[in-house]
């Protein structure tokens, strides 16, 4: 599509609908996975390990996801990711066996990698660069809305059918997501061969290693910044409830604080994307991280529910205005040929950060204090802001002109 003919309304249902439903499905089952493991007799440490298999499945599946997307096309990779997740939910909900349950958790992580990479690659291909940040921010926003709605729908189903009801909601949402995604035009039908690029007069088959070598500067600079961003974002989700527990707040109060912060986070995605498209990526990326960092540094200074709410809202505001920034920067710098390989490596770095962030918080909390660990996470946000402020290309002042094809 050209900028003159492109409209968000044209792609809203088929592009964002699957993401909304995928988020709803995952939001429905993620809170009950630990409860299911405990009901099956798993100890608390084993339950934590089983939940961690979801993140591990995503981490280890980013490269295979890129290969699947390159081979079968974005549309069918999105469909496969949704259906694979539905199957995984069935294993978790009705197996009755911890080994099969563990496999289901790992498969959920696999499906996240496949679905997320393929949808990002698809929209990078079809959306004009002038609208890219708005679309990527909306993509991230619809996923967050789905994740927000999911637990409420699951709660009603659990009331009627027990824990299995949540998995039923998740499976229905994922199947609907796959059906809707199947209506997307198939990019593999286009004339461009994304598996090869021409060097001189000879085509060269692209591999993960060749893509890594060709884009190593991007991964070492912007990629490192994205790793830090991912670590901060994941750790903030743990830091707020842990500090609430440190303040001895009631669980219901903690839930309200977290819910209000999530609402702020969820509502800011489109304005942020518009600013990125019109003024440049740096105008959103840097303020997002600075605000998150300030909120995290303030968090250990809070002493009651009111001050904790203010800090949590600041953190959520910073994260909310940065909705879609990781996907946008990845899309901006992904090459036309081998795009799925590039995005697989990009997501791999983000998942490494997501895995390491909470581990660092845990280590600092154990060796120093919880407040020190949270403050270190805030400092990491400022470090990421500086890294990205320096390395986001100045030519990218508007609408991602730094993209290379």
Where does each model-flagged region fall?
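Juxtamembrane intracellular "pre-TM" segments in multi-pass secondary transporters
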Residues: 1-9, 186-222, 405
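Helix-loop boundary and gating motifs at the non-cytosolic
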Residues: 9-55, 221, 230-243
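Core transmembrane helices of Major Facilitator Superfamily
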Residues: 26, 107-119, 314-326
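Helix-to-loop junctions at the C-terminal end of transmembrane segments
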Residues: 61-73, 268-280
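Helix-breaking motifs and short loop linkers at transmembrane-helix boundaries and internal kinks
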Residues: 73, 94-96, 280, 302-303
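Structural signature of the two symmetry-related core transmembrane helices
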Residues: 76-90, 171, 283-297
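Cytoplasmic helix-loop-helix junction between adjacent transmembrane helices
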Residues: 106-143
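C-terminal membrane-cytosol helix-exit motif in multi-pass small-molecule transporters
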Residues: 172-194, 384-392
């Amino acid at each position: 599509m050209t900028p003159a003919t492109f409209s968000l309304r044209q792609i809203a249902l088929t592009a964002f609908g699957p993401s909304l439903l995928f988020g709803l499905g995952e939001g429905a089952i993620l809170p009950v996975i630990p409860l299911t493991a405990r009901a099956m007799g798993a100890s608390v440490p084993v339950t934590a390990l089983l939940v961690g298999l979801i993140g591990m499945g995503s981490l280890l599946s980013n490269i295979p996801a890129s290969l699947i997307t390159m081979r079968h096309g974005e549309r069918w990779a999105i469909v496969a990711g949704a259906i694979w997740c539905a199957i995984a939910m069935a294993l978790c909900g009705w197996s009755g066996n911890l080994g099969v349950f563990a496999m289901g958790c790992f498969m959920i992580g696999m499906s996240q990698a496949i679905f997320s990479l393929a949808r990002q690659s698809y929209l990078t291909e079809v959306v004009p660069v002038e609208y890219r940040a708005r679309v990527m921010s909306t993509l991230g926003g619809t996923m967050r809305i789905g994740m927000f709605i999911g637990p409420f729908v699951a709660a009603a189903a659990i009331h009627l059918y027990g824990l299995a009801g949540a998995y039923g909601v998740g499976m229905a949402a994922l199947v609907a997501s796959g059906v809707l995604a199947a209506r997307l035009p198939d990019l593999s039908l286009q004339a461009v061969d994304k598996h090869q690029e021409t060097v001189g007069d000879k085509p060269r088959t692209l591999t993960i290693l060749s893509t890594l070598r060709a884009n190593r500067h991007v991964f070492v600079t912007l990629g490192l910044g994205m790793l830090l961003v991912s670590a901060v974002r994941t750790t903030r989700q743990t830091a707020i409830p842990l500090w609430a527990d440190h303040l001895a707040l009631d669980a219901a109060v903690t839930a309200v604080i977290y819910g209000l912060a999530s609402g702020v986070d969820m509502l800011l995605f489109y304005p942020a994307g518009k600013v990125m498209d019109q003024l440049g990526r740096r105008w959103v990326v840097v303020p997002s991280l600075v605000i998150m960092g300030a909120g995290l540094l303030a968090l250990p200074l809070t002493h009651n529910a009111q001050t904790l709410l203010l800090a949590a809202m600041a953190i959520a505001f910073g994260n909310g205005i940065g909705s879609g920034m990781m996907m946008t920067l990845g899309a901006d710098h992904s090459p036309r040929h081998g795009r799925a390989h590039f995005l697989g490596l990009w997501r791999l770095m983000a998942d490494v950060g997501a895995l390491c962030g909470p581990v660092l918080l845990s280590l600092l909390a154990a060796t120093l204090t919880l407040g020190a660990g949270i403050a270190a996470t805030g400092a990491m946000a400022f470090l990421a802001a500086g890294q990205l402020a320096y390395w986001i290309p100045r030519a990218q002042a508007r609408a991602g002109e730094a993209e290379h094809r």
